[in-house]
Amino acid sequence: MLVLGIESTAHTFGVGIAKDQPPYILANERDAFVPKEGGMKPGDLLKHHAEASGTILRRALEKANISINDINYIAVALGPGIGPALRVGATLARALSLKYNKKLVPVNHSIGHIEIGYLTTEAKDPLILYLSGGNTIITTFYKGRFRIFGETLDIALGNMMDVFVREVNLAPPYIINGKHAIDICSEKGSKLLKLPYVVKGQDMSFSGLLTAALRLVGKEKLEDICYSIREIAFDMLLEATERALALTSKKELMIVGGVAASVSLRKKLEELGKEWDVQIKIVPPEFAGDNGAMIAYAGMLAASKGVFIDVDKSYIRPRWRVDEVDIPWRN
């Protein structure tokens, strides 16, 4: 079985191709939209994805050394994500499905991140940290679905860091030589400033932390503010994670999503793993950010259990939660 996967939920337009036997991933091509200034405007995202889609599709097929006729199914991320961006991927997937008579496989973007984590880390029964620009979720698989033990109550951890560095003119670009701008800034800081620390049960709140940090700009060294906001945010995440580990007694902790690439977070998680005697399994950088390979791979798993959707019912779902998705391939 060969599945072509399309990812377009946010800043990245990606196309991946997955096979139902090793090495599983045959292609993983993408292009990310980076605004010249400010945040991402939905209209700019749509324009970028529409212009990049043809080139990325062709590159993926060339990388896998196959033609579109060799593909069995078309998988597409229908949510969660930004509406105009989602529509580009959905429109391309529907067009390919109709023109080449291929069944369409609906994929939840979050499930894509989680399943590529299972594949690349070889985790068996982990507690999962899903950390990206739009999501901060602590979850694990139980009775047919991924159940949420904790999540952000407002903005996501990755989004909080992006907004801070943008507001203090450290970004865009947000990632420089593999490092987030807040990590680069934090390396020159050492003073831990007093900022809000909000953990409620296993849920976290980052909006007050962001506001308080921005109010310190001009009053404290920017490097110390960067250091403080990052350290406090990561400590909040670790406290919530420790509570979930205590509740679930899991012996593996799998980290997926773009924030998983943070070197400083990795060090904290490794220390947590030693303290709790838990194996830390972090998705490789190539598959940490948004990518088409994870959609193709999750689509392949879904297709193996007959999960398809009619083209005329393939609506985008910008607020599609991970705990709303049935996972028949793990039962």
From Swiss-Prot:
Q: Where in the cell is it found?
A: Cytoplasm
The source's superkingdom equals Archaea
Its Enzyme Commission number(s) read: 2.3.1.234
Q: List the GO cellular component terms.
A: cytoplasm; EKC/KEOPS complex
What's this chain's function? Answer: Required for the formation of a threonylcarbamoyl group on adenosine at position 37 (t(6)A37) in tRNAs that read codons beginning with adenine. Is probably involved in the transfer of the threonylcarbamoyl moiety of threonylcarbamoyl-AMP (TC-AMP) to the N6 group of A37.
Q: What class of enzyme is it?
A: transferase
Per UniProt, which keywords does this protein have? Acyltransferase, Cytoplasm, Iron, Metal-binding, Transferase, tRNA processing
Record-given protein name: tRNA N6-adenosine threonylcarbamoyltransferase
Output one GO BP term.
Answer: tRNA threonylcarbamoyladenosine modification
The terms under GO molecular function for this entry are:
iron ion binding; N(6)-L-threonylcarbamoyladenine synthase activity
Residues reported to bind Fe cation = H109, H113, Y130, D290
Q: Which positions does UniProt annotate for substrate binding?
A: Y130, L131, S132, G133, G134, D162, D183, S262
Entry cofactors = Fe(2+)
Catalytic activity from the UniProt record: L-threonylcarbamoyladenylate + adenosine(37) in tRNA = N(6)-L-threonylcarbamoyladenosine(37) in tRNA + AMP + H(+)
Stated family: Belongs to the KAE1 / TsaD family.
**What remark does the entry make about the cofactor?**
Binds 1 Fe(2+) ion per subunit.
Mind telling me which PANTHER family this protein's record contains? TRNA N6-ADENOSINE THREONYLCARBAMOYLTRANSFERASE
